[in-house]
């Protein structure tokens, strides 16, 4: 999820790709100050502090009535409709985009022109480096942010915010 690199005060974490194409963090031990922030934010090393359990399963189903958005989307267009509502409030939307080099990155932007890039599922690992830091900055400035990512990325964002809940 790359959250460890975002919270590292010494920027001493890089990522190496294994034979299967997955990224693994590499710590420059000479630069590391052993603050352990990387471990605290890691959803693997430090699992969720609280688990929300419901008595009954909570299931929702929906899709947009906007046929063009629904056709261009992979999940009924609900993400796009939520994002448009966020943009109308001059807030920020975060999500995955394809890059020119055929990789995928997480971004945060307040320009609705970027929505078609964010729309749709991306079936490969996305680079989140920098996005958690940027989201935290925007939240501290009082901005609203709508972030969409994989479960591990959402958990990493929550942990990088110090497990603080924002409305």
Map each language-model feature to its residues.
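Glycine-centered flexibility sites
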Residues: 1-4, 34-38, 76-77, 149
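Iron-sulfur cluster-binding cysteine motifs and their immediate structural context
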Residues: 3-26, 36-54
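Short, charged amphipathic alpha-helical surface segments
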Residues: 30-31
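Iron-sulfur-associated redox domains of electron-transfer enzymes in respiratory
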Residues: 46-167
């Amino acid at each position: 999820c790359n959250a460890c690199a975002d919270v590292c005060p010494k920027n001493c974490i890089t990522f190496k790709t294994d034979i299967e194409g997955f990224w693994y963090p590499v710590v420059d031990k000479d630069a590391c100050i052993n603050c352990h922030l990387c471990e605290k934010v890691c959803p693997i090393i430090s699992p969720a502090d609280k688990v929300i359990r419901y008595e009954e399963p909570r299931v929702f189903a929906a899709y947009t009535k906007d046929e063009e958005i629904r056709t261009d989307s992979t999940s009924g267009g609900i993400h796009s409709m939520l994002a448009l509502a966020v943009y109308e409030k001059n807030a920020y939307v975060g999500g995955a985009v394809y890059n020119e080099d055929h990789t995928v990155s997480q971004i945060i932007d307040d320009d609705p022109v970027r929505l078609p890039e964010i729309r749709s599922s991306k079936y490969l690992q996305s680079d989140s480096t920098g996005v958690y830091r940027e989201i935290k900055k925007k939240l501290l400035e009082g901005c609203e942010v709508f972030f969409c990512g994989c479960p591990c990325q959402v958990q990493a964002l929550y942990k990088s915010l110090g497990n603080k809940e924002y409305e």
